[in-house]
Amino acid sequence: MNPIVEFCLSNMAKGGDYVFNQLENDPDVDVLEYGCLTHCGICSAGLYALVNGDIVEGDSPEELLQNIYAHIKETWIF
């Protein structure tokens, strides 16, 4: 069982696509995309993804990727 990272298509258009593609190449992470994750306020303010249901944000695609991996490392129990 891998950690699940979910992306909103609107947020991917803002730079989240870079993070999505990086994670998609990681066999230890499951990546999903949705039309909307219903976090419109956060989505309009910047980059974010849901990591096992938790909101993880970043000011740049690189920072978001770094924060996602940090969150997985801190919270993943498998």
UniProtKB/Swiss-Prot annotation:
InterPro entries: DUF1450, UPF0349. It comes from Staphylococcus aureus (strain NCTC 8325 / PS 47). Belongs to the UPF0349 family. It holds the Pfam family DUF1450. This is UPF0349 protein SAOUHSC_00876. Disulfide bonds: none annotated. It comes from the Bacteria. The lineage of its organism: Bacteria, Bacillati, Bacillota, Bacilli, Bacillales. Transmembrane segments: none annotated.
